[in-house]
Amino acid sequence: VTASQPTLQRARGRARVGFKRRGDQTVLADLHQSGCAKLRLPRRSKDAPGEAVIINTSGGLTDGDHFDVTAHWAEGARATVTTQAAERVYRSRGGDARIDNRLEVAANAAALWLPQETILFDGGRFQRTLKIDLADVAAHLLACESIVFGRGAMGETVHAGHVFDRWRVRVAGELVFADGFELSDDQDIPQLQLDRPAVAEGARAIATAIVIAPAMHWLGATCAWG
């Protein structure tokens, strides 16, 4: 008789943060946190941009876990959203962990989305979606997401696992950037796929970064985040 795997408690985290302009300062406009998702707001000088730090108190993600973050920048707001530490995706029993992030940036706002890297451990599986909506061409964005395949300094390798990373960026409702990266052991050992020139050419970390800002800033003017 084959025993079925027990049903385990899964981690659920949801966070929402919003920033607005008050005079010449950026202040908090909205804050919600539930489950394993927590937000911290570091102390800063009055004229400094806003900042929110995301914390996953579960210590990492595995199959069936779901982490959801929404961030909003009102008109003229300037703020950075980052994480306290690298996210960790641990060995799965078969399913995928899910990470869903949504950013909404109003006109003349400056949004920096700069989480630390996501570390995929051997056997880890996750799907991540980042949806970004900029109100118009006057909105500013700097966003970066990165994935590390095993901790090289610890001698770790990734022989099995699955990654699906999906970006969708819209400006005034128009799709301006769409990207999807998938790596799965259904095709080959992930480490061997990363060795291929068209994939990572032997690298064990990848990153996607995007900057959207009015063209005048590339002509020498100071950008909204300094």
Please report, for each region that a protein language model flagged, where it lies by residue.
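Internal, conserved structured core segments that host functional sites
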Residues: 95-159
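Short beta-strand/loop motifs in extracellular/secreted proteins, especially
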Residues: 77, 139, 165
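One face of beta-strands
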Residues: 15, 67-69, 99-101, 109, ...
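Residue-level recognition of well-ordered beta-strand positions that form the cores
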Residues: 18, 53, 70-72, 102-104, ...
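N-terminal, charged/glycine-rich beta-strand/loop interface patches
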Residues: 1-117, 122
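A structural signal for small-residue-enriched, beta-sheet-centric alpha/beta enzyme cores
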Residues: 147-226
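Solvent-exposed residues in well-ordered beta-strands and their adjoining turns
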Residues: 18-22, 74, 106, 133-135, ...
